[in-house]
């Protein structure tokens, strides 16, 4: 029996991506990142095979290192890793998630690869909108749009966010509304902050409130922007 049936949970594993993993490693002696490509891709391939056995629909690989400056050698390394890993995705759909910036140095390569979803930061990713306008976004992929700030405690500026959403919808891009990064950076909820003055808390949105913002933005965009 798979995990989904045994626990009644349709989980989505979130794993540090292979490229970011290598970029965080320190190499000693004569070893370098390229020497570990084979072993690392084999490990990620096994992970995807196990996810297929467990009937997992989506697997998320976090690749924040993609927002850093990348040269041709870095882009080639990314290709070497994922061209191999994605061969074993089978029925699993793979989301590559980026955050804390934009992917200007690898956008065209990223969108051409066999990912099913691509997560982009629309807040700290200053070039994200321009990249989509300049190069488009593939019709066969889902854009996980980081529209609600996952790092700070402030409420979302709905009007500004909905303008971004409208631009994406006009391009007929399949969009999932998301936070710009994990919500581990913010407090859990405002519900128990009973000692905060209302004139202050009125401007705050913690983790639970940010999820509500995503729901509200989705409802408004579906109702009024179509």
Regions found by a protein language model. Give the residues of each.
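Conserved small/polar residues in nucleotide/adenosyl-binding loops
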Residues: 1-6, 223-224
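Structural preference for beta-strand elements that scaffold enzyme active sites
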Residues: 10-12, 57-60, 93-95, 117, ...
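Active-site beta-loop-alpha junctions enriched in small/polar residues
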Residues: 16-20, 64-66, 97-103, 123-125, ...
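Alpha-helix-loop-beta-strand connector modules within alpha/beta enzyme cores
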Residues: 75-92, 214
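N-terminal small/glycine-rich loop or linker at the start of catalytic domains
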Residues: 7-33, 183
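Flexible inter-domain linker/hinge segments
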Residues: 202-216, 220-226
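Catalytic-face loop-and-helix region of soluble metabolic enzyme cores
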Residues: 109-205, 220
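Conserved, mostly hydrophobic/aromatic
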Residues: 4, 51, 63, 110, ...
């Amino acid at each position: 029996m798979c995990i989904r049936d045994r626990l009644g949970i349709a989980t989505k594993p979130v794993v540090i991506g292979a490229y970011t993993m290598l970029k965080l490693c320190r190499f000693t002696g004569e070893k370098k990142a390229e020497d570990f490509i084979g072993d690392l891709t084999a490990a990620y391939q096994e992970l995807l095979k196990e996810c297929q056995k467990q009937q997992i629909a989506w697997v998320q690989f976090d690749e924040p290192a993609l927002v850093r400056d990348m040269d041709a050698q870095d882009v080639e390394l990314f290709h070497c890793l994922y061209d191999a890993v994605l061969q074993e995705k089978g029925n699993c759909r793979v989301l590559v998630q980026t955050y804390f910036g934009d992917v200007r140095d690898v956008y065209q390569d990223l969108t051409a690869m066999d990912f099913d979803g691509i997560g982009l930061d629309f807040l700290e990713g200053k070039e994200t909108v321009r990249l989509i306008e300049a190069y488009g976004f593939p019709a066969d992929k889902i854009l996980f749009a980081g529209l609600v700030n996952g790092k700070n405690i402030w409420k979302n500026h709905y009007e500004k966010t909905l303008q971004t959403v409208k631009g994406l919808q006009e391009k007929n891009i399949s969009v999932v509304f998301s936070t710009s990064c994990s919500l581990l950076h913010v407090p859990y909820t405002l519900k128990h902050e009973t000692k905060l003055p209302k004139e202050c808390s009125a401007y705050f949105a913690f983790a639970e409130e940010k999820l509500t913002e995503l729901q509200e933005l989705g409802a408004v965009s579906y109702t009024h922007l179509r």
